[in-house]
């Protein structure tokens, strides 16, 4: 499972999260299962074809049916960015641990306003409606009829069924960027498939998985690993973010913290991204992962604030939007994403 973490008791550095998270958003299919891989060095390839188990192809999508696309713009000065990342980890460099704020990162390496305007103009002229742009100019959402998307990106879009009756669609041919977009766009997402899943599940052995005599308590973990909370550092003044597709009831969290007991002084708040449901569990049993993540962070850093970014599903678009909102909100120093899929598998080359 993917769990991104940094110690909550360390001095606060702006934008190590910003630079790393921004760098991952533009990469097409970080959570991909198995794709039709074409030449990875071809800048015209905006999106490959994602292969997921259990998909049922329902045929070509109606020409007038709406399709949402997400475009991730390229960073400026990529060589300079790569060098800076190396220097920030080099003890002999003057840039060692000298991190940028999210605003500094966006100004130095992010897309410019002129580049964003060029992209939105190209899309609008092609018949797209630009529905949202991120504050750091990195992500652009747009919608258009399927036939417009197919013609513009030289692809073919099919409707598919994926584990439910929700309306899902995907490109079944690689999507090609028009010449005008190649210098501006790193990747485009032309599907709304759920590409990740949580991993929490009941233990296969018999007996309860919770309670005073089963499993390790927060105190047991804190003592065994000599966590900072056992040395007077409870995370106060720091904030952790969780990206997940279900909320968890406060009553459940309160029961957990009261049982052990843990004196929580930090806050737990929610942010809805792309219509994620706040106030009740959603997406089947995924709330168990939310409970596990929130209780783990809240139990081992009781003074830290936690912001749960609730997304509607574990599709690429929602995951990227949540990561980008965390960067724009400038609250969290650490991000937890406890979900994942199979590694990307490409063709073997001799």
Regions found by a protein language model. Name each.
Residues 2, 26-27, 286:
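Generic alpha-helical structural signal
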Residues 2-17:
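Bacterial N-terminal signal peptides that target proteins for export
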Residues 14-26:
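Bacterial N-terminal signal peptides
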Residues 18, 135-136:
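Short hydrophobic "helix-edge" motifs at membrane interfaces and signal-peptide entry regions
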Residues 28-32:
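Boundary at the C-terminal end of the N-terminal hydrophobic targeting segment
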Residues 33-135, 141, 146-347:
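Substrate-binding/charge-relay-adjacent region of secreted/lumenal peptidase catalytic domains
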């Amino acid at each position: 499972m993917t769990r991104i973490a940094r110690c909550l008791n360390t001095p606060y550095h702006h934008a190590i999260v910003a630079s790393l998270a921004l760098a991952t958003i533009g990469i097409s299919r970080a959570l991909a299962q198995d794709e039709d891989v074409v030449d990875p060095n071809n800048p015209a390839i905006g999106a490959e074809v994602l292969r997921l188990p259990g998909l049922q192809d329902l045929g070509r999508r109606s020409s007038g049916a709406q399709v949402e696309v997400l475009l991730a713009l390229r960073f400026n000065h990529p060589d300079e960015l790569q060098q800076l990342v190396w220097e920030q980890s080099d003890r002999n460099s003057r840039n060692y641990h000298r991190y940028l704020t999210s605003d500094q990162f966006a100004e130095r390496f992010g897309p410019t306003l002129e580049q964003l305007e060029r992209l939105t103009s190209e899309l609008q002229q092609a018949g797209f409606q630009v529905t949202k742009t991120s504050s750091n100019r990195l992500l652009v959402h747009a919608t258009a009829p399927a036939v417009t998307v197919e013609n513009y990106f030289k692809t073919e879009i099919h409707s598919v069924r994926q584990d439910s009756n929700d309306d899902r669609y995907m490109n079944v041919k690689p999507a090609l960027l028009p010449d005008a977009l190649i210098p501006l766009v790193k990747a485009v997402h032309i599907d709304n498939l759920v590409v990740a899943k949580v991993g929490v599940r009941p233990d296969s052995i018999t007996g309860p998985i919770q309670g005073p005599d089963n499993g390790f308590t927060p105190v047991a973990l804190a003592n065994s690993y000599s966590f900072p909370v056992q040395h007077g550092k409870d995370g106060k003044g720091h904030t952790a973010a969780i990206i997940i597709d279900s909320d968890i009831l406060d009553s459940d969290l309160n029961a957990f913290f009261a049982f052990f007991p843990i004196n929580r002084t930090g806050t737990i708040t929610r942010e809805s991204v792309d219509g994620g449901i706040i106030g009740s569990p959603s997406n089947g049993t995924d709330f168990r992962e939310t409970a596990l993540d929130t209780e783990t962070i809240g139990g081992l850093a009781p003074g830290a604030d936690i912001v749960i970014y609730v997304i509607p599903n574990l599709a690429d678009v929602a995951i990227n939007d949540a990561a980008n909102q965390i960067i724009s909100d400038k609250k969290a120093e650490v991000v937890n994403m406890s979900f994942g899929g199979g590694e990307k598998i490409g063709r073997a080359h001799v």
